[in-house]
From Swiss-Prot:
Belongs to the inorganic phosphate transporter (PiT) (TC 2.A.20) family. The chain crosses the membrane at residues 3-23, 44-64, 82-102, 114-134, 138-158, 181-201, 207-227, 264-284, 287-307, 329-349, 384-404. Potential transporter for phosphate. InterPro entries: Phos_transporter. The keyword Cell membrane applies. Keywords: Cell membrane, Membrane, Phosphate transport, Transmembrane, Transmembrane helix, Transport. This is Putative phosphate permease PYRAB14010. GO terms for biological process: phosphate ion transmembrane transport. One of its GO terms (molecular function) is phosphate transmembrane transporter activity. It is a multi-pass membrane protein.
């Protein structure tokens, strides 16, 4: 087969997938900051766009797996044409589902979408035995674990922040004492996450020592100084909210940067596979990723956030429950902590599901009536149909390509 038109088509679909990731998943990173009023939607898309591109281009992995997450057995695919058609089908299946979900403002997992696409074409080509069902079980487990653990963490962290900062007997003293502690702890987690997720460090222990503790300590000292100098005797609640508002922009910005570094692979993995086949004849289990393909993925994500990200931002930031800066900070802190612990334990986790779970947890800390139950129901349904719908679309597209190709 002549590879040039197939490579061009894959590049176009990779860009489309990156756009869809930006519109849905990347928009999620800024949703709590927008919902809490820390920044405007226009500021959010600008910040997210720049940081997503930066994360993808400068910190995206230069080697990516052709078969994401080991979800199907690559030894059963020896024909390069199958990998080309499969990559196209998986990209298109995932992209179509992400666009549908985004249109209705539903935050879904882009990783689960591409997994569905891969399983769809794999089953059509080689039957059910090609699927690693143990791995699929861990994906299903992540649907259940991620939001529950995220909600539990956020519920208790917000209760603790409310008790130590917002509702204590001596609020001025408590705000000065405890706000820097909570913010410092959050930055220990964020510094460690940056080491592992963005710089791709292997050791959690080294991440805590090299970046986590130093960053957390510096932020603790800066926050303490600001509260003492700028808010000596004024309303401590306003002082705490002021600090949390500024911090929330930083935590959301980190989420955007890390998301670009990690999830760009969902769009460019299949593109890199087809590019390697076009230039070298066949792709192995891992393929090199040229910088220009990383740039393509980063650009697509940035454009997606800017042009269509507002729908998911509105759902997560405003429709599930009412957010303030302390609640928004709690969500970011909880989600980052859960993802870090899950990575350390090797547990399957979805960042999207964890963030939504944390939003629900913060709402539940104020009572069940603070939650928009119909929105939560729609989101949960969308999570459970993500893999089957993306898989079905991918299967149909692969079958058509296999027949006409």
């Amino acid at each position: 087969m002549d590879m040039d038109p197939w490579l061009l088509l894959t590049l176009i679909l990779g860009l489309a997938m990156a756009w869809a990731i930006g519109a849905n998943d990347a928009a999620n990173s800024m949703s709590t900051a927008v919902g809490a009023g820390a920044i405007t939607p226009k500021q959010a898309v600008l910040i997210a766009g720049i940081l997503e591109f930066t994360g993808a281009y400068f910190f995206g992995k230069t080697v990516t797996e052709t078969i994401r997450k080991g979800i199907i057995d690559p030894s059963r695919i020896s024909d390069p044409n199958v990998l080309v058609y499969g990559s196209l089908a998986a990209l298109l299946g995932a992209t179509i589902w992400l666009v549908i979900a985004t249109k209705y403002g539903l935050p879904v997992s882009t990783t689960h979408s591409i997994i569905g696409g891969i399983v769809g074409y794999g089953v059509v080509y080689a039957g059910l035995e090609i699927v690693n069902w143990g791995k699929m079980a861990s994906v299903v487990l992540s649907w259940i674990l991620s939001p529950i653990v995220g909600a539990i963490f956020a519920f208790f962290i917000f209760k603790a922040i409310r008790r130590t900062v917002l509702e204590s007997e001596d609020p001025i003293r408590s705000a000065k004492r405890w706000s820097p502690v909570w913010i410092g702890l959050a930055f220990v987690v964020i510094g460690t996450m940056f080491y592992i997720k963005v710089l791709h460090g292997k050791s959690l222990y080294m991440g805590v020592l090299k970046l986590g503790i130093p960053v957390g300590l510096v932020v603790f000292l800066i926050t303490s100084m600001i509260l003492r100098v700028k808010f000596p005797k004024v309303d401590p609640y306003l002082g705490a909210e002021f600090i949390f508002r500024r911090v929330q922009v930083i935590t959301s910005g980190y989420v955007a940067l890390a998301h670009g570094a990690n999830d760009v692979a969902n769009a460019i993995g299949p593109v890199a596979a087809v590019y390697t086949i076009a230039t070298m004849g066949m792709a192995g289990a891992k393929v090199p990723v040229p910088r220009w393909i990383l740039a393509l993925g980063g650009l697509g994500i940035a454009i997606g956030v800017a042009t269509y990200g507002y729908r998911v931002m509105e759902t997560v930031g405003k429709k599930i429950t009412e957010l303030t800066n302390t609640r928004g900070f709690t969500i970011d802190f909880s989600a980052a902590t859960v993802v870090l612990i899950a990575s350390w334990l090797g547990m399957p986790i979805s960042t999207t599901h964890t963030v939504v779970g944390a939003v629900i947890g913060v709402g539940l800390a104020r009572g069940v009536k603070a939650i928009n139950k119909s929105i939560v129901r729609d989101i949960i349904i969308s999570w459970f149909v993500t893999v089957p719908v993306a898989g079905l679309i991918s299967a149909i597209i692969f079958k058509i390509l296999w027949i006409v190709g």
